[in-house]
Design a protein with these regions (language model features):
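Acidic, low-complexity terminal tails and accessory targeting/binding regions
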Residues: 1-3, 89-103, 161-210
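Active-site-proximal alpha-helix that buttresses catalytic centers in soluble enzyme cores
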Residues: 2-3, 7-78
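Generic beta-sheet signal
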Residues: 4, 53, 147-155
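Active-site metal-binding loops of divalent metal-dependent hydrolases
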Residues: 10, 157-158
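Phosphate-handling substructures
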Residues: 28-29, 73-136, 195-196, 205-210
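Short beta-strand scaffold positions
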Residues: 57-58, 135, 154-155
């Protein structure tokens, strides 16, 4: 069995911005508050006395920058690994649209399907396929859990929802807020959630990984 930390990158919209759906093709950088969220994660790890043995992230700017900030604060001296399986979902014609625009074009039920029930709406032009996303989520976690030492995985909300679905435990809410942290324990092809969607906290991290 191996334990891993999973984190969502920080904010990509500032206070005056209208949030839109940001997928694989919307490669936005972290805004100032998003960088602060990455620093909060790095500082929590530092306070818990933990330096990751591996730091793994998706190829998009927002996850790579978050990993860079965490590496600098924790004294991580290795090479950050870029795993394409951690790339956010390509939301197709939903990408770049606000929730109001999506409801107007596709209907409230389609939005609720993903936002409230955490299932992919019927007929959407998202990619990869549902099956591929599920397989990638479990494989990426299993690979990270095979590390000698703690692996920290930084990815995006859509991928974290598929990771949540691949793990056992209290179902709860699969959504992970920007900058928040999750933990899982993997063994073979199965795994369980240790905690989900928590603000980075040194005591919480030390309790599970100290």
């Amino acid at each position: 069995m191996g334990r891993i930390l999973l984190a969502r990158h920080g904010n990509t919209f500032g206070p005056g911005d209208t949030p839109v759906w940001v997928g694989a093709k919307e490669d936005l950088p972290l805004v100032e508050s998003g960088e602060a969220q990455a620093r909060a994660l790095g500082e929590a790890l530092q306070a818990a006395g933990i330096t990751p043995a591996r730091l793994i992230c998706g190829p998009l700017k927002r996850t790579r920058r978050a990993a860079e900030i965490v590496a600098g604060l924790t004294g991580f001296a290795g090479q950050t690994e870029i795993d394409p399986r951690l790339t956010e979902i390509d939301y197709g014609s939903w990408g770049g649209k606000s929730n109001d625009e999506i409801v107007a074009e596709f209907g409230q039920e389609a939005l609720d399907c993903w936002d409230k029930r955490h299932t992919r709406p019927d007929g959407v032009d998202w990619s990869p396929s549902d099956a591929e996303l599920k397989a990638n989520a479990l494989a990426a976690m299993a690979d990270a859990a095979s590390s000698r030492g703690l692996a920290l995985v930084i990815t995006s909300n859509g991928i974290l929802r598929y990771m949540h679905a691949a793990l056992s435990g209290d179902d709860g809410n699969a959504k992970v807020k920007t900058g928040n942290l999750c933990a899982a324990e993997l063994g073979g092809t199965t795994g369980s959630r240790l905690f989900w969607n928590e603000k980075p906290d040194a005591d919480l991290i030390a309790r599970h990984f100290g």
